[in-house]
């Protein structure tokens, strides 16, 4: 028996780093307009990064944005099978990042670039399976302890996964069923 699997289309949006000479970041609204309209973004991607960048001088801002360049912001997976559901994705995933600077340059370091560590603090995965009743999960990750210090190896200290109940679509929804959550500490 012949087995056939239709081709798939994966759309992936990456952080562009610095666009332009003045340290501008790609406009989030421009990026969001390209997303599948049935699944608006639920994770604020720009605010945590913007807060980090606002404290930096231009050369350091360039180094921070260089560290973020190429980070995956969102992925959508479709099947190109010619059916009426071809425009509905199987899965939508989005991620939110924060920046951590370590080993700031000292007085004897001259003009060396600053070193930033971009890390994922939240991920949302919605499994549409081309239907109308998606399953949504969030994964929240904390890398710092109460004193704001990172693990010596950059490992997450706390990871929490939340599965949203059926019928849940937005953060303002109040579903009848309970959320399911697991948390682990290292």
Please state what every model-predicted region is.
Residues 1-186:
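Non-catalytic interaction/targeting regions
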């Amino acid at each position: 028996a012949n087995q056939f699997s239709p081709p798939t289309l994966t759309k992936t949006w990456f952080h562009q780093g610095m666009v332009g000479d003045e340290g501008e970041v790609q406009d989030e609204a421009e990026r969001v307009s390209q997303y599948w309209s049935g699944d608006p973004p639920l994770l604020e991607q720009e605010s945590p990064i913007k807060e980090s960048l606002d404290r930096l001088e231009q050369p350091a801002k360039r180094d921070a944005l260089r560290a973020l360049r190429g980070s995956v912001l969102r992925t959508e997976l479709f099947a190109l099978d010619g059916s009426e559901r071809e425009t509905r994705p199987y899965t939508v995933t989005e991620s939110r990042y924060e920046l951590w600077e370590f080993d700031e340059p000292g007085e004897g370091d001259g003009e060396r670039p600053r070193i930033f560590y971009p890390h994922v603090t939240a991920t949302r995965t919605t499994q549409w399976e081309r239907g109308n009743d998606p399953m949504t999960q969030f994964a929240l990750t904390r890398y710092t302890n109460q004193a704001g210090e990172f693990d010596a190896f950059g490992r997450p200290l706390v990871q929490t996964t939340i599965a949203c109940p059926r019928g849940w679509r937005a953060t303002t929804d109040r579903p009848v069923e309970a959320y399911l959550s697991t948390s682990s500490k290292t």
